[in-house]
Amino acid sequence: LRLRGPWIASEYYRDERTADAMKNGWLYTGDIAVRSKDGYIKITDRTKDLIKSGGEWISSVDLENALMSHPEVFEAAVIAVPHPKWQERPLACVVMKEGSTVTKEELMAFLEEQVAKWWLPDDIVFLDEIPKTSVGKFLKAKLRENIQEIYPQLTFG
């Protein structure tokens, strides 16, 4: 999604990220969006959260929504992890509802009914919580740091 208009700032205040975000008068938001035939715009993902696996794109948001539709899942975040053959693969980080006894295998079977086989995460990690910003958005950079402690062999780019 790119934006341009008189209401769009021409630069970030004292921020070196201006060069990446502002190009030729356009603000590159970092969002992936689709436009309906009626002209409505729907933001579907963030470019930094898309997972490129074997040349195909996997939406982390769609996987998160599929996982969170399971009745025993409280919340879920999906991140890309490096893979020697496929470049990146999804890793699901899941917080279960209190008292849940669902297993990885049961969650995978649940996902198999909802997404393409190549979208299935390589692993599911159960966590007590997913780090969030002050407004409740997932802090995926912090989540990657936490996951690297669990999987020290991973090197995030």
Put a short name on every predicted segment:
Residues 2-5, 10-11, 20, 32-119, ...:
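AMP-binding/adenylate-forming catalytic core of the ANL superfamily
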Residues 25:
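FAD-site-proximal beta/loop scaffold in flavoenzymes
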Residues 145-157:
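Acidic/polar alpha-helix N-cap and adjacent early helical turns
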